[in-house]
A protein has these predicted regions:
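Hydrophobic residues within alpha-helices
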Residues: 17, 209-212, 443
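Mid-domain catalytic core of redox enzymes
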Residues: 199-206, 227-337
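Active-site/ligand-binding neighborhood in enzyme catalytic cores
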Residues: 107-220, 225-226, 388-397, 401-402
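A conserved FAD-binding loop/helix module that cradles the flavin
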Residues: 427-448
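A glycine-rich dinucleotide-binding beta-alpha-beta segment and adjacent secondary-structure elements
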Residues: 162, 166-179, 327-329, 366-430
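C-terminal segments that line or cap access tunnels to active or ligand-binding sites in enzymes
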Residues: 298-386
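N-terminal glycine-rich phosphate/pyrophosphate-binding loop and immediately adjacent elements
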Residues: 2-118
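Hydrophobic, well-ordered secondary-structure elements that form the walls
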Residues: 255, 295, 341, 360-361, ...
């Protein structure tokens, strides 16, 4: 059987790209070595859901965060802005009054990025981008220009005084990156994780989009559970894949959901790349910084242990020296499997007994004292089980120099590689992790414009 395209699948973006190409009448083979178990994290744009022809359930937890404090107190943040203000008022009357204005201004900035995230990355001098910024008005333009490079600590200190509120919000600026809240660019990452969420909600949803797409039969789409050993090339052009069992399958288009380093330096022949580009690909930063713990037991809501900005900065200090944080940032979410706990920071190759992580989680999160631990996955385990390079779920760190029109490199930002017919669609591509399926959507649209 002949195929128009082969998609190398390692996650939601590869699934979205494969389904959308098949929906446009292409014969597509999706080669997937593993079926990741972790739920998809991030905004799923309604445009993608509509084009896939899905009815997708998106969780809407309320409160969306319960910020825990060391003394046992808690700050509940609700989807209703007024109700959150009432909660904040117990800690600061001033912050309660400022909360609605903060939510309004962050939502205005996030809406600009919603437009940018569903298309190939735009050059900052592009007229449409400039008009979008102009549409923010003077106040919004100042907010955007100040926010992009600044540490999230400065953004939040400008608005609030309550440590618990600032810590819970700042956590989205350091999620899955080896930086602390005082690092430059963390305010941009805070905003990135707000894109697509309702005004006043600063946690992206979780969905079962990948699971639904694996279950969805589509004319022209074929699945094969196999390891991709090589991307075959001839005269500088992709011509198919070599599987782990030695089978060769040909197609004029190969779309890789694997990270750029693995795709271009291991699966494909790097000899087809300019040496400077090959060096730059090898230097893309993709460091995992977290472990995932799963506990059995009853649901405990959406818990955050990030009691202050200073606490988060101290947690980050440990990983700089290759150590697991003894006082970590924790984020816990109920799921059909139990309570999933994000434990940050855990460096790649950490030597500590992972049993200590469970003890720390039990100490800091209520209700886990007698809960059975099901599993602990460190960065190396997440690379093996989920296909995340070095345990980095975004395949390339979402730092400001690896974002937007520079994601993951300016030379690769349009999803096309220098090897003719080879495309990149994984979360290392614009807009990055935290927007489920958008990179796969954008890549598929770029391929279809080539009229394959």
């Amino acid at each position: 059987m002949s195929f128009h395209a082969i998609v190398i699948g390692t996650g939601v973006d590869a699934l979205v790209a494969a389904h959308l190409l098949a929906r446009r009448g292409k014969q597509v083979l999706l080669v997937e070595e593993r079926s990741p178990a972790i739920r998809d994290f991030g905004w799923v744009p309604s445009q993608i859901v509509a084009e896939l022809g899905l009815a997708l359930e998106v969780e809407a937890p309320d409160p969306w965060a319960v910020a825990l404090l060391p003394d046992g107190a808690k700050l509940e943040l609700w989807r209703d802005i007024g109700r959150s203000s009432q909660s904040i008022r117990h800690y600061s009357e001033r912050d309660a009054q400022k909360w609605p204005g903060f939510c309004r201004r962050m939502a205005a900035l996030a809406r600009l990025f919603e437009q940018l995230y569903l298309e190939a990355p735009t050059d900052p001098l592009n007229l449409r981008f400039a008009l979008g910024v102009r549409g923010l008005g003077r106040e919004g333009m100042v907010d955007l220009m100040r926010l992009l490079p600044m540490p999230v600590t400065e953004l939040l200190d400008d608005w609030f005084e309550c440590d618990a509120l600032k810590g819970a919000l700042a956590a989205m600026g350091i999620l899955n990156i080896q930086q602390g809240p005082r690092s430059g660019g963390t305010a941009f990452r805070f905003l990135h994780h707000h894109v697509g969420s309702p005004e006043g909600v600063f946690r992206p949803p979780r969905t079962e989009l990948s699971t639904r797409l694996r279950q969805l039969a589509r004319l022209g789409l074929y699945f094969k559970a196999a390891e991709t050993k090589k991307i075959l090339t001839k005269a500088g052009r992709a011509r198919g894949v070599l599987l782990g069992d030695g089978e060769e399958i040909e197609a004029p288009i190969v779309v890789s959901g694997a990270d750029p380093r693995r795709t271009l330096l291991e699966l494909a022949d790097p000899g087809w790349l300019d040496p400077e580009l090959a060096r730059a690909v090898g230097n893309i930063r993709a460091r995992g910084v977290a472990a995932r713990l799963l506990f059995e037991g009853p649901a405990n809501g959406n818990l955050v242990f990030a009691p202050s900005l200073d606490y988060l900065e101290r947690a980050y200090d440990e990983i700089k020296y290759g150590r697991v944080s003894r006082e970590p940032y924790l984020e816990a979410h109920s799921s059909p499997r139990g309570l999933e706990v994000h434990f940050q920071y855990v460096p790649q190759g950490a030597k500590e007994d992972f049993g200590d992580l469970a003890a720390t989680a039990r100490r800091l999160l209520p209700g886990l004292e007698n809960a059975k631990l099901v599993s602990i996955l460190g960065p190396a385990d997440l690379e093996r089980d989920e296909g995340w390079p070095q345990g980095q779920p975004y395949h390339a760190e979402l730092a400001l120099d690896q974002a937007l029109w520079m994601r993951p490199l300016p030379e690769l930002s349009q999803y096309k590689t220098p090897i003719e017919g080879l495309w990149l669609c994984g979360p290392a591509m614009h807009p990055g992790g935290g927007v489920a399926g958008a990179a796969g959507y954008n890549c598929s649209q770029a391929i279809l414009k080539e009229k394959i």
